[in-house]
Amino acid sequence: MLNSFKLSLQYILPKLWLTRLAGWGASKRAGWLTKLVIDLFVKYYKVDMTEAQKPDTASYRTFNDFFVRPLRDDVRPLNTDPNILVMPADGVISQLGRIEEDKILQAKGHNYSLEALLAGNYLMADKFRNGTFVTTYLSPRDYHRVHMPCNGILREMIYVPGDLFSVNHLTAQNVPNLFARNERVICLFDTEFGPMAQILVGATIVGSIETVWAGTITPPREGIIKRWTWPEGEHEGSVALLKGQEMGRFKLGSTVINLFAPGKVNLIASLASLSVTKIGQPLATSTETFVAPEVEPAPLPADEIKAEHDASPLVDNKKDDT
């Protein structure tokens, strides 16, 4: 019954107004109160402030400043092998694997539509049918900037208005087409591994989604699909990003979905649902060049994995009582 009640709240609560309220509060300068809120947040979610460029919580004027805090340059080493794609975000893998024609795995026994995720853009969807996907959830404790898995030339960006359902174990199991219903920003890149989409998905209390080339994409929330295009590389006005370079950020967190063309990449074999991710670590390898099979993400301490799982609502430690 408790889970049924929680799920009902996802439909009943005014998620847009809650999100606006959270965004308003997170942007306010409140002196000692801001520091108190940040300190409580750090303690509750076990945020490792030693990784931040500014480890002193008093140095953040607003909660948003804290939430998008940059990390020290040395804490996320980048795998520089040109045949290896790297993880775009700190977080936990929700699902990953093969796109089955138009179906992407949302949760065990539940799929959603590739074409719906891409706002009905069947031409873009055709690039990724039978390709590969990875869905990464960023928990509240995580670094909330998103980076490039490989070198890329930006070709298209689409803002898709939508719902603001929370992303967690309960909604993934019970809200049909969750990621294709939520607000999102779709970024399409040309890469040496074929076309790649990197999709930033909103959720309840995600105050804004930003990119490095266009700034804040949402808000405002105008309720209409918006589309931008860019020229190929070497042309005036083109946008080129390097592997490991920041491409966007969330103010209050959510989900990143990566789509890769069929036959272009092999996911690292040890990765699975609930694997903890760190920016710059191996995610996939090229299918066209030999890469040593022992390539793996660097092992993480057990307490770091536990803290990440404890903070992630994707990990369901309670028996479902519905």
UniProtKB/Swiss-Prot annotation:
Give the matching Pfam families.
PS_Dcarbxylase (PF02666)
Claim: Membrane is one of the keywords in the record: yes
Q: Where is this site: Cleavage (non-hydrolytic)?
A: 253-254
Q: Residues bearing Pyruvic acid (Ser)?
A: 254
**Cellular component terms per the entry's GO annotation:** plasma membrane
**Per its Swiss-Prot or TrEMBL entry, what cofactor is needed?**
pyruvate
Kindly tell me the pathway this chain contributes to: Phospholipid metabolism; phosphatidylethanolamine biosynthesis; phosphatidylethanolamine from CDP-diacylglycerol: step 2/2
Comp. bias regions, Basic and acidic residues: 303-322
Q: Which family does it belong to?
A: Belongs to the phosphatidylserine decarboxylase family. PSD-B subfamily. Prokaryotic type I sub-subfamily.
Can you say what this protein is called? Phosphatidylserine decarboxylase proenzyme
Give the species this sequence originates from.
Salmonella paratyphi C (strain RKS4594)
